[in-house]
Amino acid sequence: MANITAQMVKELREKTGAGMMDCKKALVETEGDMEKAIDYLREKGIAKAAKKSDRVASEGMTHVISNEKHAVVLEVNAETDFVAKNDNFQQLVDALAKQILAVRPDSLEDALKTEMPNGQTVQDYITEAITKIGENISLRRFEVKEKADNSAFGEYIHMNGRIGVLTLLEGTTDTTVAKDVAMHIAAINPKYISREDVSSEEVAHEKEVLTQQALNEGKPANIVEKMVEGRLKKYLSEISLEDQPFVKNPDITVGEYVKQSGGKVVSFVRFEVGEGIEKKEDNFVEEVMSQVKK
């Protein structure tokens, strides 16, 4: 039997919003498998949805810039929100974005080795900034996109860089449309461009969960299939950009809005500061005791 810890129960509660005892039972029933426990709670109708993404817990900012042919979106992390709002930090982020746009390195490792206009490597430039600012700073990730002539980049930065989105549309040069789509992505956070992009494995998994959910609700077997079909269609439309109601005009979908310009969304990148990074949580008792001992 798997050892179910309080931390595992806490994590499952955060991901599903289910009660403590329900989470503990789910973990026991699934031998401590977190993903299976999420499915178990969903099938029982206890968890409304699986929040499988890691907690957002780091500071820093994203940035998006472009030129005639290329665009870059990147994330730079710092330890505190205070530093993230510092002018020196924001200038560093802008300088790193311009460097990556100019050099277009293939990887993060390559980016850190490139030489900036002042002769420093990117890594040395960051190290120097750490000394001046007094916090650990890191270039976490970036993506570079290239466009053809009859295309448009859309750039959108939300909440002073908390979220950065870069879109690429083909078949139109309308940057307003491209930016509107980027704004929508920042707000709604779709997983895919279209439902055709969803893997068969994900569809099969969701169908299995929805089927078990319907059966557990006591629905007759002869109508379960139709229920699952309807719920699956709704699920796919919710995670697919083109099928989502457009935030600026919910009467049409994003796909319909883009089609009016003669274009098509071919790619998008959405970075949210700290997603997938879990900040260290100090034990409250230990924190108090550490202060007492000083």
Curated annotation (Swiss-Prot):
Keyword Oxidoreductase included in the entry's annotation: no
GO cellular component term, pick one: cytoplasm
N-terminal signal peptide: none
Biological processes, Gene Ontology terms: translational elongation
Keyword Cytoplasm: yes
GO molecular function: translation elongation factor activity
PROSITE patterns xrefs: EF_TS_1, EF_TS_2
Principal subcellular localization: cytoplasm
Compartment annotation: Cytoplasm
Keywords: Cytoplasm, Elongation factor, Protein biosynthesis
Region (Involved in Mg(2+) ion dislocation from EF-Tu) residue spans: 80-83
Pfam families associated with the record: EF_TS
Functional summary from the UniProt entry: Associates with the EF-Tu.GDP complex and induces the exchange of GDP to GTP. It remains bound to the aminoacyl-tRNA.EF-Tu.GTP complex up to the GTP hydrolysis stage on the ribosome.
Family membership: Belongs to the EF-Ts family.
Official protein name in the record: Elongation factor Ts
Gene name of the record: tsf
